[in-house]
Amino acid sequence: METTAAATAAERRRPLFTTEELGGRAVYRVQAATVAAGILLVLYYRATRVPAAGEGRAAWLGMAAAELWFAVYWVIAQSVRWRPFRRRTFRDRLAERYEQNLPGVDIFVCTADPQSEPPSLVISTILSVMAYNYPSEKISVYLSDDGGSILTFYALWEASIFAKKWLPFCKRYNIEPRSPAAYFSESKVHHNLCIPKEWALIKNLYEEMRERIDTATMSGKIPEEMKLKHKGFDEWNSDFTLKNHQPIVQILIDGKNRNAIDDDRNVLPTMVYVAREKRPQYHHNFKAGALNALIRVSSVISDSPVILNVDCDMYSNNSDSIRDALCFFLDEEMGQKIGFVQYPQIFNNMTQNDIYGNSFNVSYHVEMCGLDSVGGCLYIGTGCFHRREILCGRIFSKDYKENWNRGIKERGKENINEIEEKATSLVTCTYEHRTQWGNDIGVKYGFPAEDIITGLAIHCRGWESAFINPKRAAFLGLAPSTLAQNILQHKRWSEGNLTIFLSKYCSFLFGHGKIKLQLQMGYCICGLWAANSLPTLYYVVIPSLGLVKGTPLFPQIMSPWATPFIYVFCVKTLYGLYEALLSGDTLKGWWNGQRMWMVKSITSYLYGFIDTIRKCVGMSKMSFEVTAKVSGHDEAKRYEQEILEFGSSSPEYVIIATVALLNFVCLVGGLSQIMAGVWNMPWNVFLPQAILCGMIVIINMPIYEAMFLRKDNGRIPTAVTLASIGFVMLAFLVPIV
């Protein structure tokens, strides 16, 4: 008996997860130290070689300010690179200890617009998270529909019927992925793993369902006979509008009802539709408000101790993701500290060379791992498992013991209608009035980047977080497939993050004394995206104008002072390339990423910066734009061919075209004047500026093609080209003094 007890105790001491420091840190630290020395020399040179008035002093000081900012941001970025580590889980140990006592999991899926986020896409995500390799009776799925659309409700009702066949099929053949849309799109890979007749039957059922849903979406209405299938359809009457309607909570599958079973007679997960009450006179707080509504609704239906939230386009790609996350929460030694577990946001529609720089590979393989080593990764708004208690404001305490069995007990005497009525009362417009919801309880309000500020608040309450990036991606979604979508998304992100930085929730202020300095700095990497806009815009415009106007802004190439400039640029660039290749990018993908960083800095981040400043002085109100998840056929084809998509006369395209054209004209004009000896100065005085201008021209080659060579509908419109020519002519009137 003693031997058995000792063996059991030893088994429980075996960790459910381990950490492993990433390699190559010695090389990194040498690189960082030498680059830091080079940066100091560059700044010293700028400070001690200021030209006389009228000889480019203002431009020189502007260059010094831009380089000082780049130096500060570089230091901030190094905070997460000093000691990053990777995590590994042990699901077999989890099963040995907890298989009979696994906690319940509530899964939140949010959608806002059936046009930008088609219902057929939403239900594929819903079906994928219902089919986890996890006891179905312990899974509850909640869909928040901020569009309040009968089309989305209809699609969810269709999914509740199809789930009876889909879930047994998934578990019988242990298929991956468990999104029907993704699975059948990879049919050539999976077809031979199943009985052909059964595979064909399920595929036909899915395609018929999707066609019914898509037909209804295109027509904007559902067949009248369908409205008789479920009482929930009665909620939509003639007075119902998107921004003015009553609250709706409908339980489509009651997982605690013994009759809610699939075709193999196994219990189905609970499925709930939620549409918050909307009234014109009440602010609904966007996605943060939707998540808080789901927290309350789920508390009276399933009340599971673990909550997963995913965006409606981020389907489950790994059926063991719940078990991996639980390895962190349930670890006997370290799990008590962990408040949330974050998976990366990975996209399945990436082109081979990531034309729009959507991959975030370096962020996930380096930066998030580095944040993990200093107290916790960021909460990025999707693919995240939380303890319910931390979303309800709990402060970390060593004495706190989680009740992992909450929500599993059988329901009392309340019937489903009473439960729905009770839940509906929790999502009215007035429920949160004079409460701490959105402040100390739930997801934070008042910021477009509600995920970042909520994660920071959790860390400041003493909790840590864990980042896990398994070989098989846990979630896959849709990246923006046009330049306009990409610019919009990054504008929203950068604006939200800068708003946080400029508020009382700045990580240096709010986190002082609560989280490590490195973590405070780590939050600023994304918090200061928008602040890179003006220095970047300055650096891609002023040196080029100086080249054509005969104003040198760098040491001549033969001077010893040119060495730190060259060293910092080359080593930073090469190490960035090394990180990108190590993280899975291609060489061309890295190059595309450099272009997109410049494009985002002078458009997305610039707009985000301006809008944030406007908001700070009371000139505009916070808004939220939904990034479209679908593109037209021609746009999709050009995306697959890795051709940049323009096609409209948006102001941001004018900025991009102007910067590209300005550098081309300055390069040609500047070199012509140097060769002609116009400036009466040695040619090597202007060589650094010519090299910088030339690199900007090379990186903008796709822009020139879109302006002058392409004939497709995705080219830069003639109006944009003409406007950019006009702005270039105006730029030459700017004196470089």
UniProtKB/Swiss-Prot annotation:
Residues at the catalytic site: 146, 451
Keywords: Cell wall biogenesis/degradation, Glycosyltransferase, Golgi apparatus, Membrane, Transferase, Transmembrane, Transmembrane helix
Single GO BP term: plant-type primary cell wall biogenesis
Any matching Pfam family: Cellulose_synt
Membrane topology: Multi-pass membrane protein
Claim: Membrane is one of the keywords in the record: yes
EC top class, as a word: transferase
Subcellular location: Golgi apparatus membrane
Main function: Thought to be a Golgi-localized beta-glycan synthase that polymerize the backbones of noncellulosic polysaccharides (hemicelluloses) of plant cell wall.
Family named by the database record: Belongs to the glycosyltransferase 2 family. Plant cellulose synthase-like E subfamily.
Name of this protein: Cellulose synthase-like protein E1
Originating organism: Oryza sativa subsp. japonica (Rice)
Highest classification ranks of the organism: Eukaryota, Viridiplantae, Streptophyta, Embryophyta, Tracheophyta
